[in-house]
């Protein structure tokens, strides 16, 4: 099911109520339900609201994409928190690479941050490094930087947050038995803020959903904010190309904003033609 949830329409409530419905009305084992969102704070708050609503502990998994995928890698490769590259390790690695390649810059921290951002974008987009053109340095130089950064992580048995996605996808592609085990564990998948999903996150979700296709996604294509990290709201726009039988529901009442704000926002966003056409009304 695809739920188009406008601003202030109760996205979190929809997710928690749907989860409650699966357990109480459909008899689904709570341990087979996976709820994913984009920030740790959001996942924690959603879990708190759900547990309060249930008035008892339920073993539903609430987490971010990275937390869920890292848990999968922990089982497969015996990773621990020590295997996650710390920021200071990543920055020191980049300083050494920059010095080795004799790269020039105005501000070291900004330059390193920008390079790491580009490396992250390449990983999250799933594009070949040979097809990426850097904004910070010549293409051949960037490829050297990218390769040396990867080698540093590999030699030290470290992964960064983007590797959590890349390695999980590779694991599922290479080990059908492991994929089947996780498909059996998480038979029902609910995703909040789906408009901010990126290509590799979505590829993994499709593999997890498998033939059961028990996906319940909630989002608003008008509110995508993570394009700089590879988010692709067009994935949501074309969701029904992958799941043509999915039902679409529109939550069209904004309970947060007054009428003139809702009307003005609707007029502005209406100029964007690459979106779901929808009209949002104010509650009052």
Model segments located where?
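P-loop NTPase Walker
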Residues: 1-80, 180, 234, 263-266
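Proline-centered turn/helix-capping motifs that create local helix->coil transitions or kinks
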Residues: 107, 124-127, 212-213, 268-278
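Conserved AAA+ ATPase "sensor/coupling" helix adjacent to the nucleotide-binding pocket
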Residues: 50, 96-100, 264-272
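Residue-level signature of catalytic and energy-coupling elements of molecular machines
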Residues: 8, 39, 64, 94, ...
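ATP-hydrolysis module of ASCE/P-loop NTPase motor domains
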Residues: 57-59, 77-163, 186, 254
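Conserved coupling/interface region of RecA-like P-loop/ASCE motor cores
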Residues: 78, 223-281
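Conserved helicase NTPase motor core
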Residues: 1-4, 34, 42, 61, ...
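Amphipathic alpha-helical transducer elements in NTP-driven molecular machines
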Residues: 40-43, 62, 66, 87-91, ...
């Amino acid at each position: 099911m695809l739920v188009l949830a406008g601003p202030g329409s109760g996205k979190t409530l929809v997710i928690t109520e749907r989860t409650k419905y699966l357990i109480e009305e459909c008899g689904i084992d709570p341990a087979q339900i996976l709820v994913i969102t984009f920030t740790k704070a959001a996942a924690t708050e959603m879990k708190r609201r759900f547990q309060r609503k249930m008035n008892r502990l339920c073993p539903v998994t609430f987490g971010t994409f990275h937390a869920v995928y890292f848990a999968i890698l922990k089982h497969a490769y015996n990773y621990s928190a020590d295997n996650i590259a710390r920021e200071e390790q990543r920055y020191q690695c980049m300083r050494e690479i920059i010095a080795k390649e004799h790269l020039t810059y105005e501000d070291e921290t900004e330059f390193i941050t920008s390079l790491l951002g580009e490396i992250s974008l390449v990983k999250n987009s799933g594009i070949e490094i040979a097809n990426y053109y850097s904004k910070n340095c010549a293409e051949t130089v960037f490829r050297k930087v990218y390769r040396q950064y990867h080698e540093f992580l590999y030699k030290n048995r470290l992964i960064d947050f983007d590797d959590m996605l890349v390695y999980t996808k590779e694991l599922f592609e290479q080990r059908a038995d492991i994929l089947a085990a996780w498909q059996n564990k998480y038979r029902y998948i609910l995703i909040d803020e789906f408009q901010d999903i990126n290509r590799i996150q979505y590829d993994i979700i499709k593999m997890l959903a498998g033939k059961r296709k028990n996906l319940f996604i909630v989002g608003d294509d008008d509110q995508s904010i993570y394009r700089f990290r590879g988010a692709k709201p067009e994935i949501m726009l074309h969701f029904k190309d992958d799941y043509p039988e999915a039902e679409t529901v529109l939550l069209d009442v904004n309970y947060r904003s007054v009428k003139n704000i809702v009307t003005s926002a609707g007029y502005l966003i209406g100029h964007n033609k690459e979106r779901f056409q929808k009209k949002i009304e104010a509650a009052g």
